[in-house]
């Protein structure tokens, strides 16, 4: 059903420049993208979506497309920025609100207006994570900012992603997924769809590729289950990321790994400011009925050593770091409120300084932590 939902209603003819080429999915994508069609590029993991996008981007002369993604880490992987920041939609539209109402609360700076006005092509990576409501509002927003009633204000959209990998983000888990391909904006865009099918990441292992492809669509045939189970590691390397079901298990693991490192521990403690009663009330509100910290509460206290693996948990436009970015502590501050230097794969050394969180309690003056 998903395949039929995202297939184009009509395929545009290929530009004569590409007519003599072998009509591989890759060449179709290049032909449509260079012909300024709206294109949706999809395929299972390992089929080269990001590689093909990079190849196309490098071939463009003059103004390059603007690259975005729904999340900070995905945007960083594509050397771009979050879609929300790019278009100035802030936290995004409210689920049951109108576009006009959301527009009135949207704060688009002059920098955003200039960026949107100058844009010719917008790349949206990991499109499957974007909800239909957000995509519809993006369409509305670009039309309004550019004064152009064409789809997306006349900007070419190149969307990349796999709807069988990452679903759209849901604030309310009781609601069904708001798939972007069911939105009015998706229909209006008239995407030309390119599906990459050849797996390059596991090339040479045909049985494993078949097992992965079957898992992707929920169909394990033949000995696929045995092939996958044979890959289970009973003792994975210690530096591999781990997933746990409870925060207490996460804390226990992280504490144990920190103890394995040599050197001294440096402890960082938050400094609340504001009315004492407000600060106390906020502190209580961030605990569960059992007295445990709620999910999302800043780690208190934060204990670090040189060499510790850490994750950035906020987007910082000044440093370019994003929520979910991983690195290793390279050095600890020698003075109060000094920076922690973190070695990241994407950006090299970044300076992480104390971050201020603002909490509002009953609409009164917000204490700051």
Language-model features, listed with the residues they occupy:
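Conserved ATP-binding/catalytic motifs of P-loop helicase motor domains
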Residues: 1-369
């Amino acid at each position: 059903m998903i395949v039929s939902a995202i297939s184009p209603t009509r395929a545009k003819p290929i530009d004569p420049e590409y007519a003599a080429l072998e009509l591989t999915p890759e060449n179709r994508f290049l032909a449509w993208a260079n012909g300024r069609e709206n294109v949706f590029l999809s395929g299972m993991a390992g089929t080269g979506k990001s590689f093909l996008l990079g190849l196309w981007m490098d071939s463009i002369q003059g103004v390059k497309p603007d690259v975005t993604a729904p999340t900070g880490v995905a945007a960083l992987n594509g050397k771009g920025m979050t879609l929300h920041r790019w278009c100035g939609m802030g936290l995004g539209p409210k689920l049951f609100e109108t576009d006009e109402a959301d527009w009135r609360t949207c704060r688009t700076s002059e920098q955003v207006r200039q960026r949107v006005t100058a844009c010719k092509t917008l790349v949206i990576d990991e499109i499957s994570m974007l909800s239909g409501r957000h995509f519809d509002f993006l369409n509305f927003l670009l039309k309004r900012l550019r004064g152009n009633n064409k789809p997306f204000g006349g900007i070419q959209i190149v969307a990349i992603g796999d709807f069988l990998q990452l679903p759209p983000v849901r604030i309310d888990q009781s609601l069904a997924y708001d798939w972007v391909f069911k939105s009015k904006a998706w229909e209006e865009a008239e995407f030309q769809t390119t599906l990459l099918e050849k797996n390059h990441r596991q090339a040479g292992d045909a049985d494993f590729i078949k097992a992965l492809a079957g898992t992707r669509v929920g169909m394990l045939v033949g000995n696929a289950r045995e092939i996958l189970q044979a890959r289970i590691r009973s003792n994975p390397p210690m530096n591999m990321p781990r997933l746990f079901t409870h925060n207490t298990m996460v804390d226990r693991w992280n504490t144990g790994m920190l103890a394995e490192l040599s050197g001294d521990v440096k402890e960082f403690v938050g400094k609340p400011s504001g009315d004492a009663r407000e600060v106390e009330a906020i502190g209580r509100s961030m605990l569960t009925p059992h007295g445990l910290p709620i999910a999302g509460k800043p780690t208190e206290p934060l204990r670090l050593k040189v060499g510790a693996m850490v994750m950035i948990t906020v987007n910082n436009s000044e440093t370019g770091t994003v929520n979910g970015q991983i690195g290793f502590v390279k050095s600890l501050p020698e003075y109060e409120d000094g920076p922690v230097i973190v070695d990241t794969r994407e950006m090299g050394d970044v300076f992480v300084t104390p971050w201020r969180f603002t909490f509002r309690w009953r609409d009164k003056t917000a204490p700051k932590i």
